[in-house]
Amino acid sequence: MTYSRKKNPFVANNLLKKINKLNRKAKKEIIITWSRGSTIIPIMIGHTIAIHNGKEHLPIYIMDDMVGHKLGEFAATLNFRGHEKGDNKSRR
C-alpha cells in the first residue's frame, strides 16, 4: 500500500534541520544519518548523505531522479555472497 498523498512525506526532523542549515550556509558537507525511512525531497538535491546500512555509513550523492524514494533504498543491508560450490544438502 502506498503512502497517502494527503500526508506530507516523512523526513526526520534532525535530518531536515541539518540540510536547511547547510543550504543557508551554501556549504557541501557529508550528512550522516540513521534515518533510512526518510523520503528524499527536492531540497536534498546536490547533497551527499551517508546512510547507515547496519554496519557502516554509505555516502550517497542525491540526484534529481531520486526524489520521492526513501533513503534506505540506496543502502543495501544484505550481502549475498553466493552458495557454496560443493553444497549438495538440498538435493537429498
Curated annotation (Swiss-Prot):
Location of the protein in the cell: Plastid
Chief location bin: plastid
Q: Name one GO molecular function term.
A: structural constituent of ribosome
- PROSITE patterns with a match to the protein in the record: RIBOSOMAL_S19 (PS00323)
Q: Entry's SUPFAM superfamilies?
A: Ribosomal protein S19
Q: Which UniProt keywords apply?
A: Plastid, Ribonucleoprotein, Ribosomal protein, RNA-binding, rRNA-binding
**GO term, biological process aspect, one:** ribosomal small subunit assembly
A GO cellular-component term linked to this record: plastid
Family annotation (InterPro entries): Ribosomal_uS19, Ribosomal_uS19_bac-type, Ribosomal_uS19_CS, Ribosomal_uS19_SF
The record's similarity note reads:
Belongs to the universal ribosomal protein uS19 family.
NCBIfam families recorded: rpsS_bact (TIGR01050)
Q: Which PANTHER family match?
A: RIBOSOMAL PROTEIN S19P FAMILY MEMBER, SMALL RIBOSOMAL SUBUNIT PROTEIN US19M
Protein's recorded name: Small ribosomal subunit protein uS19c
Q: Quick one: which gene encodes this?
A: rps19
